[in-house]
Curated annotation (Swiss-Prot):
Gene behind the chain: rplE
GO cellular component, as recorded: ribonucleoprotein complex; ribosome
Record's function text: This is one of the proteins that bind and probably mediate the attachment of the 5S RNA into the large ribosomal subunit, where it forms part of the central protuberance. In the 70S ribosome it contacts protein S13 of the 30S subunit (bridge B1b), connecting the 2 subunits; this bridge is implicated in subunit movement. Contacts the P site tRNA; the 5S rRNA and some of its associated proteins might help stabilize positioning of ribosome-bound tRNAs.
Gene source species: Ehrlichia chaffeensis (strain ATCC CRL-10679 / Arkansas)
GO biological process entries: translation
Superkingdom, taxonomy of origin: Bacteria
Quaternary structure and interacting proteins, as annotated: Part of the 50S ribosomal subunit; part of the 5S rRNA/L5/L18/L25 subcomplex. Contacts the 5S rRNA and the P site tRNA. Forms a bridge to the 30S subunit in the 70S ribosome.
One Pfam family this sequence matches: Ribosomal_L5_C
Record's keyword annotation contains Acetylation: no
GO molecular function: rRNA binding; structural constituent of ribosome; tRNA binding
InterPro entries associated with the record: Ribosomal_uL5, Ribosomal_uL5_bac-type, Ribosomal_uL5_C, Ribosomal_uL5_CS, Ribosomal_uL5_dom_sf, Ribosomal_uL5_N
UniProt name for this protein: Large ribosomal subunit protein uL5
Keyword rRNA-binding set for record: yes
Alphabetic keyword roster: Ribonucleoprotein, Ribosomal protein, RNA-binding, rRNA-binding, tRNA-binding
Length: 177
């Protein structure tokens, strides 16, 4: 399991690579946030229910619906309209999800060559977009209404992008260059 790998192998390795004197200085993954945005389709209760069901299967816990904060005429949404769902994973469920993401989902993603450094936000957090949620093994292709995209945000307590990249490479994330 990734949690055991982190404690036994990754922490000592990063401590020497980054030159830290204390193990508490070593960066770690704090949480993983999953989001499915539906936009105007969120007002359809059938689509919204399938979105919630699929995200619950992917994450292993119940997602929360997200609502529009303000009206935008160009997108045909009004304040308070449901526009998607999200879930935040921490601790054991987070590590289980990351293991599935690294070893199953990313290799199954079509035209995936690796993660780029440009996907970091400058503070050590990584954002990944999965184009088709059917890449997850938990989703049965015959039971889905529409193929949805999933946004995955991996939040670390790393000081900068380089430390976060080293951390994620130790976990086995495939990076380009």
């Amino acid at each position: 399991m990734l949690k055991d790998l982190y404690k036994s192998h990754i922490v000592p390795s990063l401590k020497t690579k980054l030159g830290y004197s204390n193990v508490m200085q070593v960066p770690k993954i704090v949480k993983v946030c999953l989001n499915i945005g539906l936009g105007i389709r969120g007002s359809d209760s059938k689509v919204m229910n399938s979105c919630v069901r699929d995200l619950a299967l992917i994450a292993g816990q119940k997602p929360v619906a997200t609502y529009a904060k303000k009206s935008i005429a160009g997108f045909k949404i009004r304040k308070g309209f449901p526009i998607g769902c999200k879930v935040t994973l921490r601790n054991n469920k987070m590590y289980e999800f990351l293991e599935r993401l690294i070893h199953v989902v990313l290799p199954r993603e079509q035209d995936f060559k690796g993660l780029s450094v440009s996907q970091f936000d400058g503070c050590g957090n990584l954002s990944i977009g999965i184009k088709e949620h059917i890449s997850f093994l938990e989703i049965d292709y015959d039971k889905i209404d529409k193929i949805l995209g999933v946004d995955i945000n991996i939040v670390t307590n790393a000081v900068n992008n380089n430390d976060a990249k080293l951390l994620l490479m130790e976990f086995g994330f495939p990076f380009i260059n």
